[in-house]
Amino acid sequence: RDRHYIAYPKENVIKTWSEIKHAEKKPVTLWRYASTMLYFSGNEYYLTEFSSDWAKEAQMSTQPLLFGKKVIDTKLGSRAAMHTHPFFELGFEQPAQEAQGRAMLGTIGWTGNFQFTFEVDNVGNLRVIPAINPYASDYELKPNEVFTTPEFIFTFSNNGTGEASRNLHAWARNYQLKDGQGDRMTLLNNWENTYFKFNEELLAELMKEAKHLGVDMFLLDDGWFGNKHPRNSDNAGLGDWEVMRSKLPGGIPALVQSAKEAGVKFGIWIEPEMVNPKSELFEKHPDWAIQLPNRKTYYYRNQLVLDLSNPKVQDFVYLSL
């Protein structure tokens, strides 16, 4: 096993990962494979973690790390960060604070199931172990094949989490984000302003206000589609991607023209992988929605997921877009 480090002195950031290989005659199964292990000697450690849900993003909580193990993990797969963030803060001798005190910030470069383990031993030393979650993640490694773990990125600060977060911001702009140093487009989304209740005149006025604020793009959100089953609430219309004539008689071209006159770009929200049972699409093709036989159908926000493995569904989504 080889452990690798790359230091970014200007940003005060370190990136580390592990490579695992073997020379056995037959494949070896990997059951656990951490990106690294960091070891600290101190008197007190405080962990700050973040949890989320709809309308409850980034709920912060802090707790002391005492003897034993504390684990932050997720098993949600492609939705790994939905409830648990792959990010943490550590405070040394005191809870992590914005503008003072020793702090460490860390994150893992992995979009799937992850696991952070924090273990305080019997003499008060702390081990931090970031890794792919070992749950259902065994990997058969062939002889002389190299298995590379996700990268773990972390930074330290003697001046609180504010300085530490700016370290990571600078590192991301310089080394991680595409065009990180360039100007980034800003947009105004109408959702929190109007929800489903809008018309062409109101949207045109919002576009003018967006320009006045210095915003680059106006994004039209949910509620612009559906005729037989108008999308005036989240109960109907998903899947019927035709402009609602009663709400937007001029259609999308009229809105694009209003955006041009206001001097902003125009964007639009669409969720082509979802469908409401109360929609023309579902009435015509109920078999296109994913449902389990002999099970009561479960609805989340009154909608179902379309079966994108079905070529007919793929064609429908492509043509809709």
Regions found by a protein language model. Give the residues of each.
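Short Pro-Gly-centered flexible turn/kink motifs
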Residues: Y139-N158
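Hydrophobic beta-strand core residues of beta-sandwich domains
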Residues: Y8, L141, S246-P249
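Short coil/turn motifs at secondary-structure junctions
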Residues: A23, F156-S157, E273-V275
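Terminal connector regions
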Residues: F154-M185, E192
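Aromatic-lined carbohydrate-binding/catalytic grooves of carbohydrate-active enzymes
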Residues: D179-S320
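Residues within well-ordered beta-strands of beta-sheet-rich folds
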Residues: W17-K21, T148, K265, W269
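Short acidic, Pro/Gly- and aromatic-enriched capping/linker segments at domain boundaries
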Residues: N122-K142
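Polysaccharide-binding surfaces and accessory modules of carbohydrate-active proteins
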Residues: R1-E119, Y135
